[in-house]
């Protein structure tokens, strides 16, 4: 287990960093990525933007790689996934930013929600409150959502010849470390799917 991310606050930072990496690299995002050391400035924003568009957005709904859980898990049906995700978010009174037209099943939205759960867990532990509801929610969310579609997504991502290919192992390690920290057995949850 990676001891650098073996606490909820560090986990939240890891999820937020991953969310930045998989966000559209506009000028503001590029600034944050380079300032935080997440991307080598020598790569160039235009190069990263072209890779992002070519990998995730070209061809509309038939892009090479989809950042949407519902499109990565067609056997579950996107409508059902969206409804379940919205219930998750609503249970914790988390609202999507309507101005940015966020989708509940977008990878960045799921990463940001996991970061939020980790921060709530951290605050509960810091304040001497019960953190178990947030730990249980994170475990359940990982099993039902992100960890259910990440392995296939990651395999396809790592097969690309893009900058984004290098993010797959980091994201996979973060999720597996979090699951291990929560006491979830990765193989067991895969068998439940």
From Swiss-Prot:
The keyword Zinc is annotated on this UniProt entry: no
Entry-linked InterPro entries: DMSO/NO3_reduct_chaperone (IPR020945), DMSO_Rdtase_II_chaperone (IPR017843), TorD-like_sf (IPR036411), TorD/DmsD_chaperones (IPR050289)
SUPFAM superfamilies: TorD-like
Coiled coil ranges: none
Statement on biotechnological application from the UniProt entry: Has potential use in bioremediation of waste sites contaminated with chlorate, such as pulp and paper industry wastewater.
Compartment(s): Cytoplasm
This protein's UniProt keywords: Chaperone, Cytoplasm
GO cellular component, one term: cytoplasm
Family: Belongs to the type II DMSO reductase enzyme chaperone family.
Record-linked NCBIfam families: DMSO_red_II_cha (TIGR03482)
Function comment: May function as a system-specific chaperone protein essential for the assembly of an active chlorate reductase ClrABC.
The name this protein goes by in its record: Chlorate reductase assembly chaperone protein
Native organism: Ideonella dechloratans
Gene (UniProt): clrD
């Amino acid at each position: 287990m990676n001891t650098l991310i073996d606490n909820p606050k560090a986990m939240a930072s890891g999820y937020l960093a991953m969310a930045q990496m998989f966000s559209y690299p506009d000028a503001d995002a590029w600034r944050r990525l380079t300032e935080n050391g997440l991307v080598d400035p020598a790569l160039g924003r235009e190069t990263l933007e072209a890779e992002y568009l070519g990998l995730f957005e070209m061809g509309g709904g038939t892009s090479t790689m989809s950042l949407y859980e519902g499109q990565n898990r067609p056997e579950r049906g996107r409508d059902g996934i969206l409804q379940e995700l919205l219930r998750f978010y609503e249970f914790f009174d988390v609202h999507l930013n309507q101005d940015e037209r966020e989708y509940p099943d977008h990878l960045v939205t799921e990463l940001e929600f996991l970061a939020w759960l980790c921060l709530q867990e951290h605050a509960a532990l810091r304040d001497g409150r019960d953190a178990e509801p947030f730990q249980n929610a994170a475990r359940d969310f990982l099993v039902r959502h992100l960890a259910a579609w990440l392995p296939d997504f990651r395999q396809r991502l790592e097969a690309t010849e893009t900058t984004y290919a290098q993010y797959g192992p980091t994201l996979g390690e973060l999720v597996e470390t979090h699951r291990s920290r929560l006491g979830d057995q990765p193989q067991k949850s895969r068998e439940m799917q």
